[in-house]
From Swiss-Prot:
This is Proteasome subunit beta. Residues 1-55 form a propeptide. GO terms for biological process: modification-dependent protein catabolic process; proteasomal protein catabolic process. GO terms for molecular function: threonine-type endopeptidase activity. Its EC number is 3.4.25.1. The formation of the proteasomal ATPase ARC-20S proteasome complex, likely via the docking of the C-termini of ARC into the intersubunit pockets in the alpha-rings, may trigger opening of the gate for substrate entry. Interconversion between the open-gate and close-gate conformations leads to a dynamic regulation of the 20S proteasome proteolysis activity. The gene is prcB.
Length: 289
């Protein structure tokens, strides 16, 4: 395709005149086409967050040699279930994955834009961003959404990464949480959760985290945590055996980030539900037949 010469010249002059950081794709969009960024709205529009679908609970756990991040599949719109099979966890580069809770449309665009941001930097600079650089880039993106967040369009990411520059590969898993203003915190306890069911998920993980010894045990604890969150939080969806809908998860270790096969998640979900099922022990007969 041939671009008209005037358009090409105007774009080039705008870039040179504004000193855009070409290594940042998000900054380039902000200068050249801000309407393409998530939640490109202006102040004064009123709160509209409750009118849009919201994604809910994300959990992340470190295990020896890596980190796992998982999310439920439900989205809600007020008191209604808007979707049952929403994907909330995305691999964003070879050693990084993000899960985002909040306004669903913005959350998905955040994850996609962040993946492009990391790829764009690596293509221009010839090297991938360091772990610290990845955290800073995501913090800047979250901060850029602050105006929309104040109108109810909040999207909070949870970052899981494997630091290839860590001195000890067994403790190279990283979990970073963010607030709406772009502040971030590296979790030292080994686990974190965000979203409406996060308080229940974290309470569950706290009791089970001692059982985490590898990726598979971390996955089981994550499934249990999401099950517990769904038990108390209506906006979080637990494993749905009838529809065959299960949480999604990503593991990240020295070999890179990979999606956990749905077959394995379904197997663990059935085990968790089976282990928690019990005969009716209520009533005058105490459950005796």
């Amino acid at each position: 395709m041939t671009w008209p010469l005037p358009d090409r010249l105007s774009i080039n002059s705008a870039i040179s005149g504004s000193a855009v950081d070409l290594s940042s794709f998000a900054e380039f969009l902000r200068r050249q086409a801000p309407e393409l960024l998530p939640a490109s709205i202006k102040h004064g529009g009123g709160a509209v967050g409750d009118q849009l679908p919201h994604a809910t609970t994300i959990v992340a756990l470190k295990y020896p040699g890596g980190v796992l991040i998982a999310g439920d599949r439900r989205s809600t719109q007020g008191n209604m279930i808007a979707g049952r099979d929403v994907r909330k966890v995305y691999i964003t580069d070879d050693y990084t994955a993000t899960g985002i809770a909040g306004t669903a449309a913005i959350a998905v665009e955040f994850a996609r834009l962040y993946a492009v941001e990391l790829e764009h930097y690596e293509k221009l600079e010839g090297v991938p961003l360091t772990f610290a650089g990845k955290v800073n880039r995501l913090a800047i993106m979250v901060r850029g959404n602050l105006a929309a967040a104040m109108q109810g369009l909040v999207a909070l990411p949870l970052l899981a990464s494997y630091d290839i520059h860590a001195s000890d590969p067994r403790s190279a898993g990283r979990i970073v949480s963010f607030d709406a203003a772009g502040g971030w915190n590296i979790e030292e306890e080994g686990y974190q959760a965000v979203g409406s069911g996060s308080i229940f998920a974290k309470s569950s993980i706290k009791k089970l985290y001692a059982q985490v010894t590898d990726a598979d045990s971390a996955l089981r604890v994550a499934v249990e945590a999401l099950y517990d969150a769904a038990d108390d939080d209506s906006a979080t969806g637990g494993p749905d055996l009838v529809r065959g809908i299960y949480p999604t998860a990503v593991t990240i270790n020295a070999d890179g980030a990979v999606d956990v096969p749905e077959v394995r998640i379904a197997e663990l979900a059935r085990e968790v539900i089976g282990s928690r099922s019990r005969a009716d022990t209520f009533g005058p007969d105490g459950g005796e037949k």
